Each structure stands twice: as structure tokens, then as C-alpha cells.
């Protein structure tokens, strides 16, 4: 960590290690110890949630589950998989008077402050040092980018805030292989002046730390990579 690192989220509860037995659907995981866990992430997470992999869970009483998956092991470190906390983390990097869940035309963007619209994206996939988003096709994500472009052209400041939920990424790129339409919209957004800020995070014990900002990969807009 660096001298500029700081805590951006505290789970404030013990985290228990377990092992995935089965992912029975997008949102429910059964562990080897027999626990039924809620997985709050719309992505595929196939590189993280698979039988035999290590996960971190905590007690969380739901309608069908008593636990929640918070992180999974990548082989080199923990990756936070709880997407419900993304906007709470994002607030650490925004003014205190920011407005949340702002309706704009046919979309709802995450934040607004001082003539600035902000959309937050959480990234859990890293391949060969590249943080990649999305890990599953996202029409909603593409629509958000198109809205940010329109707002930029209308004179607003538009910002994409990317939270990389692990600390082993060197740079970020849209995931052309998984979602070419989103990636093209991301490229268009940057070319139209939409700003991109990428935060590298790390889970230590039961706290998430901000480590540093990273940049777009040099080949981020290369369709073939």
C-alpha cells in the first residue's frame, strides 16, 4: 500500500472463509459446509465462483439465504464480489452533498453534483494485468454510456468511475471479447470527452482499502486484443 491509501469500506462484521460447492443460479451459492449464500453481483464471475474455490462470507438473513458471499479468491488475492456496496465506496471519492440515483431521460445515473453526472461500474475481472469490464453483456451499461455522451454534449461534465475490486490490475480496458457494443460505446464516450477515473481497491481482513488510481491500457480501444 501507499501513504495515500485509506479505508473506503468496513464490513464491520466477521468474515468467514468457506469453499464453493455449487452455484445453483446467478444469485445463490451452496458452500461445502452446507451454507446457502446470496451472491449480489449480476456478472458471470465464472473465473471466481466455481466448485472448489475459496470464498469469504458473512451472516446475512434473507428470504432464502442466511449468508452473503463478499469475496472470492483469484489465486493471488481476494476479489470483492458484493456489488451492493459499490456506490457506498464511490461516495469516498465524491463531494459530501452529492445526489444519488438521479433520473435522466429514460435512464437513472448513480450520482450528480456541481453540473457533473457520475456512473459507477464495479470491475472484478483481471486477465494478464488488465482489468476488464463487463464480464457479461450489459445493455443497461451501454445505455448509461450513451446517456453520459448526450449529457456531455449538452454542456454537463460526465464521469465514469470504475472501481477495480482487487489490487492486481495494471490498467483498465473495456472487454471487447465479451461485449463489443458496450466497448464501442465506452470508446465513443471517451472520444466525446466523458472522463474516466479508475480506482484500484484491496480487501484486507474485513476492510476495503483504496490503493491508487490506474489508467486505461494503451490498447484499450484495439478491437482485436
UniProtKB/Swiss-Prot annotation:
Any matching Pfam family: SfsA
Q: Name one GO molecular function term.
A: DNA binding
Protein name per Swiss-Prot or TrEMBL: Sugar fermentation stimulation protein homolog
Q: Which PANTHER family match?
A: SUGAR FERMENTATION STIMULATION PROTEIN A (PTHR30545:SF2)
Concerning InterPro entries, the annotation shows: SfsA, SfsA_C, SfsA_N
Q: Which CDD domains match?
A: SfsA-like
What family does this chain come from, according to its entry? Belongs to the SfsA family.
**What is the phylogenetic placement of the source species in the record?**
Archaea, Thermoproteota, Thermoprotei, Sulfolobales, Sulfolobaceae
Provide the species name: Sulfolobus acidocaldarius (strain ATCC 33909 / DSM 639 / JCM 8929 / NBRC 15157 / NCIMB 11770)
Amino acid at each position: 500500500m501507499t501513504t495515500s491509501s485509506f479505508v473506503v469500506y468496513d464490513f464491520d462484521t466477521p468474515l468467514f472463509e468457506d469453499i464453493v460447492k455449487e452455484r445453483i443460479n446467478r444469485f445463490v451459492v451452496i458452500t461445502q459446509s452446507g451454507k446457502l449464500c446470496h451472491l449480489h453481483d449480476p456478472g458471470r464471475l465464472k473465473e471466481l465462483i466455481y466448485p472448489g474455490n475459496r470464498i469469504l462470507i458473512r451472516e446475512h438473513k434473507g428470504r432464502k439465504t442466511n449468508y452473503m458471499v463478499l469475496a472470492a479468491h483469484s489465486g493471488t488475492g481476494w476479489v470483492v464480489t458484493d456489488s451492493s456496496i459499490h456506490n457506498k465506496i464511490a461516495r469516498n471519492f465524491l463531494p459530501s452533498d452529492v445526489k444519488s440515483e438521479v433520473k435522466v431521460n429514460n435512464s437513472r445515473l448513480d450520482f450528480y453534483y456541481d453540473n457533473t453526472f457520475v456512473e459507477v461500474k464495479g470491475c472484478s475481472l483481471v486477465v494478464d494485468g488488465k482489468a476488464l469490464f463487463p464480464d457479461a453483456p450489459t445493455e443497461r451499461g451501454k445505455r448509461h454510456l450513451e446517456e453520459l455522451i448526450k449529457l456531455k454534449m449538452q454542456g454537463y461534465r460526465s464521469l465514469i468511475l470504475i472501481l477495480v475490486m482487487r489490487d492486481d490490475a495494471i490498467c483498465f480496458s473495456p472487454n471487447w471479447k465479451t461485449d463489443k457494443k458496450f466497448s464501442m460505446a465506452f470508446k465513443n464516450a471517451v472520444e466525446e470527452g466523458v472522463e474516466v477515473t479508475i480506482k484500484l481497491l484491496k480487501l484486507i481482513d474485513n476492510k476495503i482499502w483504496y490503493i491508487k488510481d490506474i489508467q486505461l491500457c494503451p490498447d484499450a480501444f484495439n478491437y482485436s486484443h
